[in-house]
Amino acid sequence: MAYRKRGAKRENLPQQNERLQEKEIEKDVDVTMENKNNNRKQQLSDKVLSQKEEIITDAQDDIKIAGEIKKSSKEESKQLLEILKTKEDHQKEIQYEILQKTIPTFESKESILKKLEDIRPEQAKKQMKLFRIFEPKQLPIYRANGEKELRNRWYWKLKKDTLPDGDYDVREYFLNLYDQILIEMPDYLLLKDMAVENKNSRDAGKVVDSETANICDAIFQDEETEGVVRRFIADMRQQVQADRNIVNYPSILHPIDHAFNEYFLNHQLVEPLNNEIIFNYIPERIRNDVNYILNMDMNLPSTARYIRPNLLQDRLNLHDNFESLWDTITTSNYILARSVVPDLKEKELVSTEAQIQKMSQDLQLEALTIQSETQFLAGINSQAANDCFKTLIAAMLSQRTMSLDFVTTNYMSLISGMWLLTVIPNDMFLRESLVACELAIINTIVYPAFGMQRMHYRNGDPQTPFQIAEQQIQNFQVANWLHFINNNRFRQVVIDGVLNQTLNDNIRNGQVINQLMEALMQLSRQQFPTMPVDYKRSIQRGILLLSNRLGQLVDLTRLVSYNYETLMACVTMNMQHVQTLTTEKLQLTSVTSLCMLIGNTTVIPSPQTLFHYYNINVNFHSNYNERINDAVAIITAANRLNLYQKKMKSIVEDFLKRLQIFDVPRVPDDQMYRLRDRLRLLPVERRRLDIFNLILMNMEQIERASDKIAQGVIIAYRDMQLERDEMYGYVNIARNLDGYQQINLEELMRTGDYGQITNMLLNNQPVALVGALPFVTDSSVISLIAKLDATVFAQIVKLRKVDTLKPILYKINSDSNDFYLVANYDWIPTSTTKVYKQVPQPFDFRASMHMLTSNLTFTVYSDLLSFVSADTVEPINAVAFDNMRIMNEL
């Protein structure tokens, strides 16, 4: 019988079929199929929204349903699984995107490793020229009537004249100059390396650098140069005192440049290098390790020098409240550590096929009645074993948090996890992951063995499942083992000034494995009263597989401990332990692989690997401290220069960029500002403070040497006469502000109150606005005449901002094309402004000639360990801290 569907139930089954078809179409990535999909969606929506009632029959429905069932329920379940998987993947992508917003993303592992390896001692700071801000330049001389003479005069001018206008911008320029000096500041100066021949010398003498030689050439060729100066240049040469290993070179420097270079020479970071220093540079635990045979080259020259690395500890405490930064540091340390942990190659492991065959025999797989035991052999391979070995040691070295991946039904994984939790301190695992693993072990193995009810663990419970179980289990051996795990923490020990996270002695010597085996034996002897016999047998067989390898597990524990402690000796930064934002995933099946495949071959780091690891750690740590010193100095300088608009965040960003490993744009702002606050609390390093004081004392001298800016402007209500200036001609330039009332231009611009100026000008009192202004030159006489009486200055002040006022430098001289216009000497040119510009320092040869002193020669060695040749004993004979072989099972 036909019936009519009404209301919400209309088109129910066809709609369901359409949806199933839609899902199938969504799986296909083909573009044409997507177009069909869109059409079907449109048809579906048209059907649902249409007012037309459609009549169908029972028989048709039955046929459709039967057809769907016949197509196979497997396809539907498979489809459902795919949908769930897609949803799960989508959730992971969303979580990853959320994480990306808060955690710095990292480049590929190879690039991070390369960046770490590329941080080297500052060899780039080996100077081939002296540091200079100034250079001498020739300027013409003008007569009283404005005509240019043929004579020239030498003045000190800026080498790189990029001074901006505006007092604030000029102060910012000095901050950038300071930053540039910090980058260029040499660790050492060897004048012999930069000395060049003096072409005008009588006896092939040398001067300190090429720029000094060029200045000497220019002065020697200048017609104005006195004969006595020429004779002096001809006599300029180096003076060697070989017995004292000292050489003096003549140099021509501005007094400020001389002060900088003299400071660099007197505060070099190089120190004499001898065998004792190299001996003490090698980590003490490596020196005393009987497995390594070290020989030192005793033929060090007396001129050998080295730069002591800056290895101060925990100045910023990045582990405290800097989650993203700490995550980046631990990640790069983890990648570096993984690269130096020795590989367990296939020849060092038991053959995978042979081991699986042996395990199959132990399990009597041919007589299996349950499926779960076949999982025991799943995923066991040498690559997983090697990966697990490297992950465990590298994570502990870098203090990276690990998270565990496991399947609860794989009892072998859980039993291997019991070894893992016994050997690795609890702190190394993500809390949630640790709780999940412990709960699985308790509810799958421990509680069923004693016939106890399942543990119902409350999320957020301060106690872990093992801590709860320790109080409830009566069996001494199992409770004792649980107690050990619950109290398994790193011991913090300071060795050679570095905080080390050391393992418990019972783990180091492998004795804890006996404790684990006692607990496992007790569990295998229990009756599992509430569980089927097959379940009990599966657990017992899993325990049997692990207990058969008791000797190898003891050796494995000793091997992990030895490799960890040996590599830990090469870590130079305090090993602070804080849970990291991201984690390193560890599959419990790979732990099973490691437990089952570990052989009797001892694997220890090669001495070359240890030295490489140590050098990279030292270089990164030293660079980290130097960049902190730079950032602290720049922040202090910005405050002392009153740069109130300076964004401190930019200083912190520069600091992080110079550390190489950070992706700065992804560091959250709150951590940037917290880092700024920490940097503010640190004292400025002495050398950097002295350099800043040198700049601070000489800011005016540097400003005076610039052609870009003037130091102020005098404005008046009435015109002022132009005056003769020797450097520029007939101009509106004032060389001093005597007799003028002065107002600070920066304060005036900040307040915007021009009333004071207006009142003074209306009272016919000239006023001097003091501050850095653009020094604009206009030598056209026509423009001078046009602007003479064009405006009343009081009106300019009312209508315009003073910071837009461009004082004009008027030149009237014989070079002007319009010179004939001023043939009438009765006409007196005037201006309503006068530019206040200080006189640059004249170049005086005698005052600029300085003798600089440095060592005649020395050699700086950056890699001290290159003097040490090292070898290892035969691995089979390698011993641990207790003087017993690392691997006892032969």
From Swiss-Prot:
The keyword Ubl conjugation applies. The keyword Repeat applies. One of its GO terms (cellular component) is viral inner capsid. The record marks F232, M236, M849, M851 as: Interaction with the intermediate capsid protein VP6. Keywords: Capsid protein, Inner capsid protein, Repeat, RNA-binding, T=2 icosahedral capsid protein, Ubl conjugation, Virion. InterPro entries: Rotavirus_VP2. Residues 404-424, 432-452 are annotated as: Hydrophobic. Belongs to the rotavirus VP2 family. Homodecamer; each decamer is made up of two conformers of VP2, called VP2A and VP2B. Interacts with a VP1-VP3 complex. Interacts with the intermediate capsid protein VP6. Interacts with NSP5. Interacts (via N-terminus) with NSP2. This is Inner capsid protein VP2. The lineage of its organism: Viruses, Riboviria, Orthornavirae, Duplornaviricota, Resentoviricetes.
